[in-house]
Amino acid sequence: MDKLKIIMEKGTERLKRGFAKMVKGGVIMDVTNAEQARIAEEAGAVAVMALHKVPADIRKAGGVARMAPVEKIQEIMDAVTIPVMAKCRIGHEAEARILEALGVDMIDESEVLTPADPFFHIYKKKFTAPFVCGARNLGEAVRRIWEGAAMIRTKGEAGTGNIIEAVRHVRLVNENIRLIQRMTDEEIYGVAEKFAEPYLRLAFSVKEISGLPKRVLENEPIYEGFTYREIVEDIYKILLEIKKLGRLPVVNFAAGGVATPADAALMMAMGMDGVFVGSGIFKSSNPPKMARAIVEAVNHWDEPDVLAEISREIGEPMRGQAIEELQVRMEERGI
């Protein structure tokens, strides 16, 4: 690769990650119109996520969930001074290009929307806009970081008001990082090989359909022109960085099921850099009070007396849903 191109790519990645660091320690709220966006901004949100419907309503509506209408995103962008993010479908590069052209501050390649590509996520390094992506475990997180995500969030189980899956994902990532820190570099290389395997799915499917052995050649491109070995080498470098840092090398937020100030405080206590709140604000009985309380809870997560005061007279939280009752598990979308 051309030396200047490498320098430019690294500079772009620094800029993208720099934006993510600007929202660190804050709350990002899902909004569906200008009025909700203003409520979020007044409550102290560091950014808003523009959607057509909040996840609880997406879940209820069923069908195919797509990127929000351009007019809706523009209306929200015009209403607030804080950064505006928007979601595209997993693997839907055209939706992402439209969002980038609109000038959104960050793109969420989101499992909350119906996936567009059954094999791959977007190669995010081709974009100038930063991306945030969900992850259930360290393998998913590292793959998204390798593809160019500037920020990671837990997937949780969006639209349920149930924090259990977000907690599961935080624990899985954190424990896997501790395991990586105890490993030799040789053992970590083996983990990198395992984490790179999902990129082989398309190649193996085509080989199987063609009656050929499920294996790839050393120089055979499998994703965006990269060979399996090239992907392994890059993932290995990310894992070595994680071993050194003791955490992900990008900002890591909680998302999926945050419905109360206590939920938000729990996520911060578990080491998260901030919190996304989807349905939890505008499906509560008093959105302005709940929004302000969750922002305060993130700011004072380690002060129980303050949390107790914050939690007074904020109305009813959204009605929660048991995970085992769900017909659709959004967290399982993606690779």
UniProtKB/Swiss-Prot annotation:
PANTHER family: PYRIDOXAL 5'-PHOSPHATE SYNTHASE SUBUNIT SNZ1-RELATED. Homohexamer. In the presence of PdxT, forms a dodecamer of heterodimers. HAMAP family: PdxS. Keywords: Lyase, Pyridoxal phosphate, Schiff base. It comes from Pyrococcus horikoshii (strain ATCC 700860 / DSM 12428 / JCM 9974 / NBRC 100139 / OT-3). D-ribose 5-phosphate binds at residues 30, 159, 257, 278-279. It catalyses: aldehydo-D-ribose 5-phosphate + D-glyceraldehyde 3-phosphate + L-glutamine = pyridoxal 5'-phosphate + L-glutamate + phosphate + 3 H2O + H(+). Belongs to the PdxS/SNZ family. It comes from the Archaea. Its EC number is 4.3.3.6. This is Pyridoxal 5'-phosphate synthase subunit PdxS. It holds the Pfam family ThiG. The gene is pdxS. The lineage of its organism: Archaea, Methanobacteriati, Methanobacteriota, Thermococci, Thermococcales. Gene3D superfamilies: Aldolase class I. D-glyceraldehyde 3-phosphate binds at residue 171. PROSITE patterns: PDXS_SNZ_1, PDXS_SNZ_2. One of its GO terms (biological process) is amino acid metabolic process.
